């Protein structure tokens, strides 16, 4: 059975604004996705299916295998696909302080803001406990975040020959209301799928995400926390790049001192030229090393646990 998904609900043009929707990101080389949901919903397996590789630990377990927010990256359709897996931070028994801490880390990993927030819920019995966890999750985001949310229903294979529309007609009313709240944006996933089936459901999900991004005017979700995080990240990235630049200068000075001391004691001009050539090679090698460090400075900052937001 092919993966099924609904179309994206229409958003009236006059109801959109930069403040409500976020910041324009048309032509972005990135597509940033956050996986949200209760422990055991299948977030990590879903992330692996989307990325096409095992980036996150996953398994059948009553306790969350994912302990902190983690990021995986791959390339899809010419874009850098960034997927952030979250632990069961919205489980009803998780303290709000722990939830807030991981939200802060998630913000750092997806700054300047995610294009899609995927709420992962397994098909089957949608319990009162699961509904409470969902409401806790939604309460952590402003209402505008709904425009960036997609309901991702895992364990699609449990449907067997049952049509998804028939299933949803008999689903709990609160689940039907959730689909309506997400403007009828939902997608089915079989995390046991492989090969062509896995690629097809991934394609359909990411097509739905891109369709939603277009409906949102090419914008990504942002709020004051994201704006604050981006400011912190940019500042720390600049500091790290400056540190690497100064470190390169110190390394060049050290290399020059050592070689010039050697060259000064040499009487053979040919040997002097050899040492100068060797010194230039070391200069070039060090420049390449530090250029790569500067290029990766932002990623280092994003992955650090030292980003704190007020």
UniProtKB/Swiss-Prot annotation:
Q: Name one GO cellular component term.
A: cytosol
Domain AIG1-type G, by residue range, is 28-230
Region span, G4: 154-157
PTM note says: Phosphorylated at very low levels in resting splenocytes. Rapidly and transiently phosphorylated in response to splenocyte activation.
IQ domain: from which residue to which, for each copy?
233-262
Q: Where is this region: G3?
A: 85-88
| Protein localization | Cytoplasm, Cytosol
- Region annotation (G5) maps to 190-192
Keywords, comma-separated and alphabetical: Coiled coil, Cytoplasm, GTP-binding, Nucleotide-binding, Phosphoprotein
Annotated Gene Ontology MF terms? GTP binding
Q: Which Pfam families match?
A: AIG1
**Do the record's keywords include Ribonucleoprotein?**
no
CDD domains in the record: AIG1
Where GTP binds, per the record, is at: 37-45, 58, 155-157, 191
Where do the record's region annotations for Disordered lie? 1-25
The record's note on quaternary structure and interaction partners says:
May interact (via IQ domain) with calmodulin/CALM1 only in the absence of Ca(2+). Interacts with BAX, but not with other Bcl-2 family members.
Give the function comment from the record. During thymocyte development, may play a role in the regulation of apoptosis. GTPase which exhibits a higher affinity for GDP than for GTP.
Please report which protein family the annotation says this sequence is part of. Belongs to the TRAFAC class TrmE-Era-EngA-EngB-Septin-like GTPase superfamily. AIG1/Toc34/Toc159-like paraseptin GTPase family. IAN subfamily.
Q: What is this protein called?
A: GTPase IMAP family member 4
């Amino acid at each position: 059975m092919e993966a099924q998904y609904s179309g994206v609900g229409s958003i009236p043009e006059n109801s959109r604004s930069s403040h409500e929707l976020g910041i324009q990101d048309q032509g972005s080389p990135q597509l940033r996705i956050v996986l949200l949901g209760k422990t055991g919903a299948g977030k990590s397996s879903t992330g692996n299916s989307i990325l096409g590789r095992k980036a996150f630990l996953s398994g059948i377990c009553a306790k969350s295998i994912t302990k902190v927010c983690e990021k995986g990256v791959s390339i899809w359709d010419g874009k850098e696909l960034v997927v952030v897996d979250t632990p069961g931070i919205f489980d009803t028994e998780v303290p709000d302080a722990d939830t807030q801490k991981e939200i802060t880390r998630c913000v750092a990993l997806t700054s300047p803001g995610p294009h899609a927030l995927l709420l992962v819920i397994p098909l089957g019995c949608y319990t009162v406990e699961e509904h409470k966890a969902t409401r806790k999750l939604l309460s952590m985001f402003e209402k505008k975040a709904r425009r960036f949310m997609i309901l991702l229903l895992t364990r699609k294979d449990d449907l067997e020959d049952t049509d998804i529309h028939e299933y949803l007609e008999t689903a709990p009313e609160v689940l039907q209301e959730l689909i309506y709240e997400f403007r009828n944006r939902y997608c089915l996933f079989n995390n046991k799928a492989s090969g062509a089936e896995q690629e097809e459901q991934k394609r359909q999900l990411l097509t739905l995400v891109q369709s939603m991004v277009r409906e949102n005017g090419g914008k990504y979700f942002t709020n004051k926390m994201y704006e604050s995080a981006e400011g912190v990240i940019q500042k720390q990235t600049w500091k790290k790049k400056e540190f690497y630049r100064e470190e390169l200068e110190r390394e060049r000075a050290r290399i020059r001192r050592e070689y010039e001391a050697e060259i000064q004691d040499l009487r053979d001009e040919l040997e002097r030229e050899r040492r100068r050539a060797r010194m230039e090679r070391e200069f070039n090698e060090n420049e390449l090393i530090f250029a790569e460090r500067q290029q990766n400075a932002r990623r280092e900052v994003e992955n650090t646990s030292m980003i704190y937001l007020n």
